[in-house]
C-alpha cells in the first residue's frame, strides 16, 4: 500500500559520517554536508561508497538531508521524521490500533510519542538488518531504556506499546538486538506490561509503501 510520495529526491554518494547529525556526501560531483535524522550508529548503512537519497534542506548551515540509503538491492528509510509520518499515515490500516491520535503526550516529566485512543505508543527505528530480521538498537541507548521503564509503569493501568518501524527491504520479522544494548535487551525480555509490535515500510521509486502492518516480533 502506498503511503505517500517523496518528491525531488537527489542522488548522492556517501563519503562518511562526521558526527551524530552530519554526514559528508557527494552530490553532482560536489562534496556537501547533509543532516541525518537518526541517532543510531548505522554502520552497516552509512559507509564510504554507499549510495543514498537526499532532500534539499531549507535553512540552517546544511544544504541537504539524507533520508534513505542503499540496502541489499533496495533502500533503507533512515529518517525518523519520515518513519513517523509513515506510521501516522498507516494507522488506519493497523488493526491493533484504534482511536484519536495525539502526538507528544506528556506523562509526568516525560513525553511519549503518541496516545492513540487509550493506548500509549512509543516509536523506535529498527534500522539494523541481520538476515531476515530488522533489529533495534544498534548501539547503547539510555533514552530507549528510559522510555521502556516509563511504559512499563504506564502499562500497569493502561495499554502501553513500543512499535518498531522496520524501514528496510526484505525483512520478515523484528528481533531486539542484544549486542546493541544488553540492558535494554533484558528489560524487553522481562517486560510484563508492554506490548511489542512492528510494522514494515519501504522506500521505492520515490514512494513510501506499507509492506506489513503487523510484522512478526520475536522476543
From Swiss-Prot:
CDD domains: SfsA-like_archaeal (cd22358). GO terms for molecular function: DNA binding. Gene3D superfamilies: 2.40.50.580, 3.40.1350.60. Pfam families: SfsA, SfsA_N. Coiled coil: none annotated. It comes from the Archaea. Belongs to the SfsA family. This is Sugar fermentation stimulation protein homolog. It comes from Archaeoglobus fulgidus (strain ATCC 49558 / DSM 4304 / JCM 9628 / NBRC 100126 / VC-16). The lineage of its organism: Archaea, Methanobacteriati, Methanobacteriota, Archaeoglobi, Archaeoglobales.
